[in-house]
Regions:
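An acidic- and aromatic-residue-enriched active-site/binding cleft used to recognize and process polar
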Residues: 51-52, 108
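Ligand-binding beta-strand-loop-alpha-helix segment within the catalytic cores
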Residues: 64-169
């Protein structure tokens, strides 16, 4: 029986630092090389990722708040999953490996009465300018890098697609 590794990284890991001048594709290519190394050692690999910065960027573009946070989370999961899958599948094919990729959006059930909704703490999106801080109608908190928009981060009750994840693994 093959061992299974869970390769997890945050949404910030999917962005190139500004001073490096790279793009997300270059970052993904580097990350995927680690995954291929695990596959070549005969491990099964499950990749999971964060998306805080990406969600924040989409929220910032949605001035009228036309979409709920869950919609932007799903949109970024799809975008990131697509990019990861494309990069990984290309490397697998170049190395003539038999594995195939699958992307799964994951929904989490939370308690609507969770106190986290009253005290948003999860930073999303970029560091905000002082002008944005003064005019934005959002919850904002000071972080190590500067002020950022924050959203609620309630405790998960269950992963709604857990049975599908178990079937894939």
């Amino acid at each position: 029986m093959r061992k299974t590794a869970v390769y997890a990284f945050g949404g910030n890991a999917l962005q190139s630092p500004v001073d490096e001048g790279g793009d997300a594709s270059e970052v993904l290519a580097r990350v995927m090389s680690d995954v291929i190394d695990l596959l070549e050692m005969d491990w099964s690999v499950v990749i999971t990722h964060g998306n805080g910065p990406q969600v924040g960027h989409l929220l910032a573009m949605d001035d009228q708040q036309t979409q709920g946070l869950d919609s932007w989370v799903a949109a970024t999961q799809g975008m990131i999953g697509h990019e990861l899958s494309m990069h990984l599948q290309a490397i697998l094919e170049r190395r003539r490996r038999p594995e195939r990729t699958a992307v799964l959006l994951t929904r989490v059930e939370v308690d609507k009465n969770d106190e986290a909704f009253a005290w948003p703490t999860k930073p999303v999106g970029p560091v905000l300018s002082s002008q944005t801080v003064m005019t934005a109608d959002w919850d904002i908190a000071e972080t190590v890098h500067g002020p950022r928009r924050v959203v609620a981060s309630p405790l998960p009750i269950r992963i709604m697609e857990l049975d599908v994840i178990q079937q894939l693994v």
